[in-house]
From Swiss-Prot:
UniProt keyword annotation of Amino-acid biosynthesis present: no
Natural source organism: Cupriavidus necator (strain ATCC 17699 / DSM 428 / KCTC 22496 / NCIMB 10442 / H16 / Stanier 337) (Ralstonia eutropha)
Keywords for this protein: Ribonucleoprotein, Ribosomal protein
Alphabetized Pfam families for the sequence: Ribosomal_S9
One GO location term (cellular component): cytosolic small ribosomal subunit
UniProt lineage: Bacteria, Pseudomonadati, Pseudomonadota, Betaproteobacteria, Burkholderiales
Domain of life, source organism: Bacteria
Identification of the protein by name: Small ribosomal subunit protein uS9
GO biological process terms, semicolon-separated: translation
A molecular function (GO) term: structural constituent of ribosome
UniProt xrefs under InterPro entries: Ribosomal_Su5_D2-typ_SF, Ribosomal_uS9, Ribosomal_uS9_bac/plastid, Ribosomal_uS9_CS, Ribsml_uS5_D2-typ_fold_subgr
Length: 130
């Protein structure tokens, strides 16, 4: 805990989110912008709010997020992971409910590397019989 802020780091794909929460009225600021301005897709907004809605803390915290790297989906997942960790830092009894929902576990799926002789990671060059 830093002052009256609770902190959590979240990661997803190549995105990293640093999340700070404190008691407030439910404002979420991502990289200096309101969340609805930063995330264009409704699904991204939904992903970010999931741990708050699960624990019934959607209107009780002001959240400040600094997120870098990745795309919109990766950043939304990283913010969700960071909010989950910050909530656990605030109240450890929330961990069981968040863990059961699958928000505590880091999603370890990463982009598979491109192989030599292939077009992409698994797409081979077209086979010619003759």
């Amino acid at each position: 805990m830093i002052g009256n802020w609770n902190y959590g780091t979240g990661r997803r794909k190549s995105a990293v989110a640093r999340v700070f929460i404190k008691s407030g009225k439910g404002d979420i600021i991502v990289n200096g912008k309101p969340i609805k301005e930063y995330f264009a897709r409704e699904t991204s907004l939904m992903i970010v709010r999931q741990p708050l809605e699960l624990t019934a803390h959607a209107e009780t915290f002001d959240i400040k997020v600094n997120v870098t790297g990745g795309g919109e989906t990766g950043q939304a997942g990283a913010v969700r992971h960071g909010i989950t960790r910050a909530l656990i830092d605030y109240d450890a009894t929330l961990k069981s409910a968040l863990s059961k929902a699958g928000y505590v576990t880091r999603d370890a799926r990463e982009v598979e590397r491109k192989k030599v002789g292939f077009h992409k990671a698994r797409r081979r060059k077209q086979f010619s019989k003759r």
